[in-house]
Swiss-Prot record:
One of its GO terms (molecular function) is DNA binding. It is found in: Cytoplasm. One of its GO terms (biological process) is regulation of DNA-templated transcription. GO terms for cellular component: cytosol. This is Probable transcriptional regulatory protein HPG27_148. Keywords: Cytoplasm, DNA-binding, Transcription, Transcription regulation. Pfam families: TACO1_YebC_N (PF20772), Transcrip_reg (PF01709). Belongs to the TACO1 family. InterPro entries: Integrase-like_N (IPR017856), TACO1_YebC-like_2nd/3rd_dom (IPR048300), TACO1_YebC_N (IPR049083), Transcrip_reg_TACO1-like (IPR002876), Transcrip_reg_TACO1-like_dom3 (IPR026564), YebC-like (IPR029072).
Amino acid sequence: MGRAFEYRRAAKEKRWDKMSKVFPKLAKAITLAAKDGGSEPDTNAKLRTAILNAKAQNMPKDNIDAAIKRASSKEGNLSEITYEGKANFGVLIIMECMTDNPTRTIANLKSYFNKTQGASIVPNGSLEFMFNRKSVFECLKSEVENLKLSLEDLEFALIDYGLEELEEVGDKVIIRGDYNSFKLLNEGFESLKLPILKASLQRIATTPIELNDEQMELTEKLLDRIEDDDDVVALYTNIE
């Protein structure tokens, strides 16, 4: 399954170091959402979700407010761009970026791939068909229980809102649906008054691959360089 950058980073970095790197990416998502749909979360579902995700990462309110205000300034001139690449061992990579300078972004990404023998950026559209786009929501199991709902009740309640799969992972419940069902699923959570812990649009590989430890170690070097770029807000691979 393709993995978004925040899940991989959480496993390999300390909490404060993680925060220092994730905040700029979260701020960009908030700024772009406010620029596209207005600065009022009540009428802008994309902004509401971006703020929710920022709060889940303990981003301070002042940072969130500043990111919203930035949408009306020159600093808010951001665009969303996706790039694709290949690495050794059959690894496929999709990079979702938010940038105010696409020339800088692609130059940086190319430099990371050029430092890795056998890796290269490929034309957009070359790999996209090998990933399914999904809406993914997370909530706490305890919040479901607070509503006097079983997981079966929750699944039944959200089917009409586009739910395709429900999975229990530790103390969390993961809800997946079609990419185009994101807004509808969000409305489903709101109708149930069930707090969302995190919400995102993800790319999941149709044919995931497995790497051995040595292959993974070599591949991680490239993935780490990409993830550390402030313009990259999400990274997906076909690694199991």
